A protein has these predicted regions:
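A short, basic-hydrophobic beta/loop patch
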Residues: 1-47, 98
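Amphipathic alpha-helical extensions and coiled-coil-like segments
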Residues: 48-169
């Protein structure tokens, strides 16, 4: 028997248009290969949200042993686009839902990843309520990292002063 792996919407549209013939590629594929081809076809749809897309890439990588480079080549996207999509999956589930629902953009999601994990849910909630832009989140993250670096430098100076005092004693 034959099974449509990719192009079911085109096939349905051709039936609605009463076409008697539809161009097709007939090939043998085991269940695993059929699933891979169907997933790749679905990832090329324009109506996927960024989280669905990221989950699709993750499936290609984990289930089919592809690299990001392999996956990007199969779906016609750049490796960096695949990598950026996958980064979103590191967000907490409730924040990922906000991105999936469109309350936050993918840019917001990636910007939030620069903050400590325990701060991300509250920052996401604030961003939704206050309409914080991606650029504002990026500036906040940069300021936080600058303060962390300053704190680290102060600790290093204190440690060196302490060691100098110990050597003098």
């Amino acid at each position: 028997y034959y099974q449509i792996i990719a192009g079911e919407r085109r096939w349905r549209a051709s039936r609605m248009a009463n076409l008697s013939e539809v161009p097709a590629v007939v090939m043998e594929a085991d269940d695993c290969k059929a699933m891979e081809l169907a997933l790749i076809e679905n990832l090329q749809r324009s109506d996927l949200n960024c989280v669905e897309e990221a989950l699709g890439y993750q499936t290609l990588i984990e289930h089919f042993g592809m690299t990001q480079e392999d996956a990007s080549g199969r779906v016609g996207k750049s490796r960096s686009a695949v990598a950026n999509a996958l980064r979103l999956l590191a967000l907490p589930e409730d924040v990922l839902k906000k991105v999936s629902d469109g309350q936050l953009s993918p840019g917001h999601g990636r910007s939030l990843l620069a903050f400590p994990a325990e701060q991300i849910p509250q920052l996401a909630e604030d961003a939704v309520k206050k309409g914080t832009t991606v650029r504002e989140l990026e500036r906040m993250a940069k300021a936080l990292n600058r303060k962390k670096n300053d704190d680290d430098n102060i600790k290093a100076v204190r440690r060196n002063v302490f060691l100098d005092e110990v050597e003098l004693a």
